[in-house]
C-alpha cells in the first residue's frame, strides 16, 4: 500500500513522460514570444520546427546560440486550468471513497492528493523551477559526479525555461547504457548516493527522479558514473528531525529492535500517539525479521515494502502527507535502479554511506545513533556491524 498511495500519480505521470504527442508548434512559438518578448527566430541563432521531446507538462526544443545548444522547455497551454480541474475531481473522489476503501491509514487520502496537487502547481511555475535548479546546483557544486544544466535566465520566464543542453543517455535500460560503453552499476551508485545526500545531508530533494530526468554522461569511472539531473519542478524538503529519525529507524531495522522502530514510526507520524506500540512488535518482526539475511547488504527494499503494505491493511499505520513526495522519490529511485539491475540491493550502497555519516558527523544526535550501532542491548560491541 505504501507504493500504491503514490502509485496512481506516479503511473499517470510516468506514462506521460516523453510519450505525449507534441502540441501545435505555432502555439509554442506564440508562448515563447509572449513570455520572452521576441520571436524565437530573433532570440536564437537556430530554432527547430519541431520539439525533440514532448511530455505531460511541456515540450523541449533544441535551440542554438553562440555556437552552443540549449534546451528550451515550453509549457503546454491551459495547464493551470487542467490541473486545477483534475485535482478538484480527485480530491472529491478521494474524500468520497476514502471511508469505503479497506485502507486503515488513519489520514484522509485527500491530504495526500492535496500534497501532489500542490507539487504539480509548483511544477508548472517555471520561475520557481529556475530557483530550484540554482539551489540544487549549489548543493552539488562540490560533487564531481553530479551535473546540473546551467540556467539561461534571459531566456526563461513563468512558462518558458531555458538551460544548457545535456548530451547524455537516459537511464531507461541497461542495454542502452552498455551500447554506449557506460557501466550501469556506476550510475546506480551515483544515483543512490546523490539521493541519500539529498535526504540526509541537504534536506532538499528531487521528488521526480524517473529515468527521463536523469542522464548518464561520459567520464567518471567504473565505481561512480557522471550523472546529470534535469527538470526541477517537483522538489521538496525534509526537516532535520525527520532525517535523524529516519536514520534511527534504519539502525533499529538492522539491530532488529522493533519496539524502538515502532517509536520511530510514531515520531514520524506514521502511528498515532495513542497507539499501543507493544502490539506492533510481533507484526514488525514478522515483516522485517530476517530481511537482512546473512549480511546487511542483502536487504531487499521492494520485498519489505510489499510485506509492509499488507501490514498497513491490518494495523493503524498512516502516511503523513509530508512524506508523500519522499516515498515517491524513494520508490521512483529504487524502481530506476532495479530497471538497470534486477538484483539491486539498496543497503549495499546505502549502509556504507550511513555508516560514514555516523562516523564523521559530530552532532550529539548522530553520536547517540552511532552508539546504538556499535553496542548491543547488553553493552557488547557488535563486531559484525562495526566491520
Where are these regions (language model features)?
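Single conserved hydrophobic/aromatic residue that forms the stacking wall/gate
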Residues: 1-7, 11-12
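ATP-dependent phospho-/nucleotidyl transfer catalytic cores
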Residues: 12-21, 33, 80-85, 95-206, ...
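ATP-binding glycine-rich phosphate-binding loop
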Residues: 19-30, 34-66
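A short beta-turn/loop motif at secondary-structure boundaries
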Residues: 49-55, 152-156, 324-325
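Glycine-rich ATP phosphate-binding loop
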Residues: 69-75
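Helix-rich C-lobe and terminal helical cap/extension of kinase-like folds
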Residues: 157, 166-168, 174-190, 217-387
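Conserved catalytic-loop position in the HRD/HxD motif
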Residues: 208-210
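Hydrophobic residue at the +6 position relative to the catalytic HRD Asp in the kinase catalytic loop
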Residues: 212-216
Amino acid at each position: 500500500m505504501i507504493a500504491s498511495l503514490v502509485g496512481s500519480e506516479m503511473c499517470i505521470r510516468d506514462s506521460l513522460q516523453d510519450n505525449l504527442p507534441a502540441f501545435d508548434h505555432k502555439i509554442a512559438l506564440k508562448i515563447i514570444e509572449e513570455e520572452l518578448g521576441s520571436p524565437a527566430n530573433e532570440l536564437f541563432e537556430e530554432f527547430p520546427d519541431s520539439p525533440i521531446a514532448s511530455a505531460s507538462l511541456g515540450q523541449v526544443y533544441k535551440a542554438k546560440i553562440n555556437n552552443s545548444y540549449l534546451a528550451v522547455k515550453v509549457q503546454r497551454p491551459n495547464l493551470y486550468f487542467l490541473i486545477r480541474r483534475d485535482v478538484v475531481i480527485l480530491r472529491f473522489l478521494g474524500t468520497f471513497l476514502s471511508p469505503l476503501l479497506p485502507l486503515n491509514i488513519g489520514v484522509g487520502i485527500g491530504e495526500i492528493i492535496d500534497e501532489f496537487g500542490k507539487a504539480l502547481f509548483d511544477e508548472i511555475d517555471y520561475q520557481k523551477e529556475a530557483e530550484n535548479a540554482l539551489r540544487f546546483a549549489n548543493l552539488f557544486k562540490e560533487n564531481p559526479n553530479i551535473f546540473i544544466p546551467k540556467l539561461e535566465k534571459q531566456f526563461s520566464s513563468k512558462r518558458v525555461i531555458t538551460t544548457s543542453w545535456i548530451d547524455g543517455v537516459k537511464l531507461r535500460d541497461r542495454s542502452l547504457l552498455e551500447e554506449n560503453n557506460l557501466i550501469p552499476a556506476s550510475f546506480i551508485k551515483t544515483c543512490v548516493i546523490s539521493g541519500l545526500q539529498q535526504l540526509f545531508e541537504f534536506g532538499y530533494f528531487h521528488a521526480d527522479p524517473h529515468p527521463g530526468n536523469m542522464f548518464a554522461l561520459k567520464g567518471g569511472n567504473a565505481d561512480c558514473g557522471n550523472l546529470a539531473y534535469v527538470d526541477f519542478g517537483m522538489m521538496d524538503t525534509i526537516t532535520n528531525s525527520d532525517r535523524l529519525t529516519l536514520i534511527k529507524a534504519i539502525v533499529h531495522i538492522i539491530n532488529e529492535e522493533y519496539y524502538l522502530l515502532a517509536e520511530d514510526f510514531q515520531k514520524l507520524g506514521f502511528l498515532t500517539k495513542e497507539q499501543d506500540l507493544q502490539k506492533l512488535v510481533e507484526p514488525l518482526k514478522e515483516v522485517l525479521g530476517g530481511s537482512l539475511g546473512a549480511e546487511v547488504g542483502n536487504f531487499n527494499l521492494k520485498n519489505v515494502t510489499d510485506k509492509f503494505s499488507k501490514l498497513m491493511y491490518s494495523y493503524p499505520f498512516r502516511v503523513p502527507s509530508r512524506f508523500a513526495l519522499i516515498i515517491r522519490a524513494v520508490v521512483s529511485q529504487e524502481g530506476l535502479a532495479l530497471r538497470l539491475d534486477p538484483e539491486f540491493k539498496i543497503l549495499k550502497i546505502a549502509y556504507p554511506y550511513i555508516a560514514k555519516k555516523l562516523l564523521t558527523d559530530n552532532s550529539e544526535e548522530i553520536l547517540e545513533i552511532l552508539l546504538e550501532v556499535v553496542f548491543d542491548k547488553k553493552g557488547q560491541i557488535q563486531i559484525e556491524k562495526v566491520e
